[in-house]
């Protein structure tokens, strides 16, 4: 019977720690997701050939022209 109160004490000690740890873990995951997304976007921006950039600029210019 002496083992169960010890287990309950240990569980009670661990429960408050799990909350903040899980919250911090979720925040880290979200932060990492945004960092990875930013790096991927930067890679695509810099990874394009100059010709592709020119084509994209032309497309944007065409979109900017009001259609008659």
From Swiss-Prot:
Superkingdom of this protein's organism: Eukaryota
Protein species of origin: Saccharomyces cerevisiae (strain ATCC 204508 / S288c) (Baker's yeast)
Coiled coil: none
Membrane association type: Single-pass membrane protein
Transmembrane segments: 24-44
Subcellular location: Endoplasmic reticulum; Membrane
Protein name: Uncharacterized protein YBR126W-A
Organism lineage string: Eukaryota, Fungi, Dikarya, Ascomycota, Saccharomycotina
Family matches, as Pfam families: YBR126W-A
UniProt entry tagged with the keyword Transmembrane helix: yes
GO CC field: endoplasmic reticulum; membrane
Alphabetical keyword list: Endoplasmic reticulum, Membrane, Transmembrane, Transmembrane helix
